[in-house]
Structures are given as structure tokens and as C-alpha cells.
């Protein structure tokens, strides 16, 4: 094994505790540890335990059973799949939506639909691993631009056009980067792609439900985004994923995508829960905006407490610590203080940039920030 012992990860098992936003570590013998406030999961809108999602999943269990039992093109399609695809397409202003069992599969399918060995992919340096695997599987050439730097992107596009004048260009980025909490200027990026005749794939996994008009992501209303990928495993509080695009690309995915055709369909109860989450988002369009405002208050207070300002402006608040062991020690101290956080270390992030990935949720108690600031202050001293 090439991973240094100090950086080997270990699985920890967690169980939801009695109240919303609380979790407990499960140890050997199924013993549960103390209740901790969850500042680590991607359940941004606090929907994974929402009564409406649970009721929708339970009703679908009684109707369709647990699993789909087949691929969408054989026997796995259910009415709930069709309804979710239709309502998502309407919500996002797209012609076609197709569901996938996981975000990894959706991203793999997206890249392979838009790129081949004649394509040059120009990708943000920090895109998700699933997108990089998709590029590799497509056979396309890969070039990387400086994170969220449009000047770097344009220089690279001009160079690629010079080196391969007839190649198709595909630009790949994310609307909310999971470890930095940062976002690109999507409108300007789309204008750049239009200028250089490039397709644009936008991964909205962490943005949907939180960013953009009514939580519909940063690609909403921007028709120059060729394809959107999204997930139900974060703000939607369920599981699975989807791609949204025009009708022609949607038909291409349906007919040609192995990641769509050769996999068991999304479990119907998860689709039903995602549909219930979508209804809640439509009825509460300010949830995301309120969460973003709260996250910026956290950033301001962390700066006042002597920390470097966490990057970005959404619910992912990366607190830069630097050295690996110091970050782990601080994480353990916060856990002893009743706060569950994630220490993110290389190779997930660059060397010397270990961080606590703090994640805000809609239903976090008002006093959470004060508890965090006290624990961080004590952890620094110790």
C-alpha cells in the first residue's frame, strides 16, 4: 500500500441521534458514543430526515418495493422515475432529464457523451475525481486551468485551438467546489465558451437547492451550458443523480450511454424522496439564500476570531489549518466538544492546506456558531 500510515483513512460508522442534526459514532459491539452536532454532512437543507421525504419513500416502498430490479431500458422504469425527470426538467428549464443511481455514474456518462478521442477537455484544476475518470474513459486530451481563473482558461483554449484547430473543445467545471466552497462566474464562463465554440459541462452537485434563483443552481437560465449534472444525495436529502440537457443530447444518452443503460435503475423510494424534496424546495425558494447569508456571518465571525477568511460564499466553510496532524488534533478536540467535523488532508487537498470542512445546515441551532468559536479557541490553546 502506497498511502503513508499517517494518511490512511479509517471507516467510522455513524447513527442519527434522537434530534435533527445530531449523530452518534457507533463503535465495536454496536455501542453508541455521545451525541454530536453534525457539521460534516452535505445535508444542506436538513431534508434527509424530513417527514415528507420519509412518508414519500415509505409509500413508494409499499407500491414498488425496495429496488427497481432492472435497468431503465428493460424492466426498471417506474412512474415515479418519469415524474421526477419531468418535474426536474421543468424546474431547471431543460428539455430532458435522465436519472442515474449515483453522481459518479452521472458524471462519467456526461463526459463520455460530450467527449471522445478527437476532443480536448479544458477542466478546472479542482474538478471532482468522477469527472477526471470520465475524461480518461472518453480518450480525450486533458488540459487543466487555474481554479476559477477565466484568463487562465482563455489562454489555454487559445493554445488548444492553435495545437488542434479542428478538435472539439469541452470545458468542465463545478458551480460549488466541495473542498473550497468557491464558485465560478458562470455567465462569463459561458460567454467565453461561446466565443471559442466550446461545449460546457457544469457539475451542480453541491449548488442545487442552495445557490441560484430558488436554489436551482448557477446554471439556471444559462442556455449556453450544454449539460448540467446534479445529485439527490446532498441538498435533496435522498440518493441518486441526474443529467439535464437538450432533447437531442438526452436521446443520445438514452441510446448510447453505458452508464445509463447497463445499470439497475435508481431505487424507487429514493426517487420518491427526491420528488418530495423538490416540492419542498419549490415551496420554500428562500431556503438556500438564507443559508448562504448565515454562512457569510460564520465567515465574518471566524475572521474576527483570528482565522483566515474561509474561501467561497456558500454553506461549505473550509477552515484552513495547514499541517495534517494539527488539523486532526483540532478535529478531535471539536468532537470532544460535541461537534462532528471532517478533517480534509492531502491528497484530497494540496500539501500544506489541510482544513476542517465545516458545513452549515438549515436546521442547525442558533447557538452552534458560538459553540464552534469557543471550541476552536480552546483547541488552539491546547
What would you call each of these model-derived segments?
Residues 54-102:
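Conserved N-terminal alpha-helix of the aminotransferase class I/II PLP-enzyme fold
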Residues 110-129, 150:
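Conserved PLP-anchoring active-site segment centered on the Schiff-base-forming lysine
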Residues 43, 143, 147-202:
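Active-site phosphate-binding strand-loop segment of PLP-dependent enzymes
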Residues 51, 55, 59, 63, ...:
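PLP-dependent enzyme catalytic core of the Aspartate aminotransferase-like
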Residues 289-296, 303-338, 353, 360-362:
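Conserved PLP-binding catalytic core of the aspartate aminotransferase-like
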Amino acid at each position: 500500500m502506497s498511502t503513508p500510515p499517517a494518511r490512511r483513512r479509517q471507516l467510522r460508522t455513524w447513527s442519527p441521534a434522537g434530534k435533527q442534526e445530531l449523530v452518534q459514532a457507533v463503535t465495536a459491539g454496536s455501542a453508541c458514543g455521545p451525541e454530536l452536532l453534525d457539521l460534516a454532512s452535505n445535508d444542506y437543507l436538513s431534508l434527509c430526515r424530513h417527514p415528507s421525504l420519509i412518508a414519500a419513500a415509505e409509500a413508494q416502498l409499499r407500491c414498488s418495493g425496495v429496488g427497481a430490479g432492472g435497468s431503465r431500458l428493460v424492466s426498471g422504469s417506474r412512474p415515479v422515475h418519469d415524474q421526477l425527470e419531468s418535474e426536474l426538467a421543468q424546474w431547471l428549464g431543460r428539455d430532458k432529464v435522465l436519472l442515474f443511481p449515483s453522481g459518479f455514474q452521472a458524471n462519467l456518462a456526461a463526459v463520455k457523451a460530450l467527449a471522445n478521442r478527437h476532443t480536448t477537455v479544458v477542466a478546472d484544476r479542482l474538478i471532482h475525481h468522477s469527472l477526471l475518470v470520465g475524461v480518461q474513459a472518453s480518450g480525450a486530451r486533458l488540459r487543466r486551468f487555474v481554479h476559477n481563473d477565466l484568463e487562465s482558461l482563455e489562454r489555454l483554449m487559445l493554445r488548444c485551438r492553435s495545437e488542434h484547430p479542428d478538435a472539439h473543445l469541452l470545458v468542465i467545471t463545478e458551480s460549488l467546489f466541495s473542498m473550497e466552497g468557491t464558485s465560478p462566474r458562470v455567465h462569463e464562463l459561458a460567454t467565453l465558451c461561446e466565443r471559442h465554440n466550446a461545449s460546457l459541462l457544469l457539475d451542480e452537485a453541491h449548488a442545487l437547492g442552495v445557490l441560484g434563483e430558488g436554489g436551482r443552481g448557477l446554471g439556471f437560465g444559462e442556455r449556453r451550458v450544454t449539460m448540467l449534472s446534479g445529485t439527490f444525495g446532498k441538498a435533496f436529502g435522498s440518493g441518486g443523480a441526474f443529467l439535464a440537457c437538450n432533447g437531442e443530447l438526452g436521446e443520445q444518452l438514452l441510446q448510447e450511454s453505458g452508464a445509463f443503460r447497463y445499470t439497475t435503475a435508481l431505487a424507487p423510494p429514493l426517487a420518491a424522496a427526491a420528488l418530495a424534496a423538490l416540492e419542498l424546495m419549490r415551496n420554500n425558494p428562500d431556503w438556500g439564500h438564507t443559508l448562504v447569508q448565515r454562512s457569510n456571518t460564520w465567515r465574518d465571525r471566524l475572521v474576527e476570531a483570528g482565522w483566515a477568511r474561509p474561501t467561497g460564499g456558500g454553506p461549505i466553510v473550509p477552515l484552513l489549518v495547514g499541517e495534517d496532524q494539527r488539523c486532526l488534533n483540532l478535529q478531535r478536540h471539536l468532537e470532544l466538544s460535541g461537534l462532528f467535523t471532517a478533517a480534509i488532508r492531502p491528497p484530497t487537498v494540496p500539501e500544506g492546506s489541510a482544513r476542517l470542512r465545516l458545513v452549515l445546515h438549515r436546521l442547525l441551532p442558533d447557538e452552534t456558531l458560538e459553540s464552534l468559536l469557543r471550541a476552536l479557541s480552546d483547541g488552539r490553546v491546547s
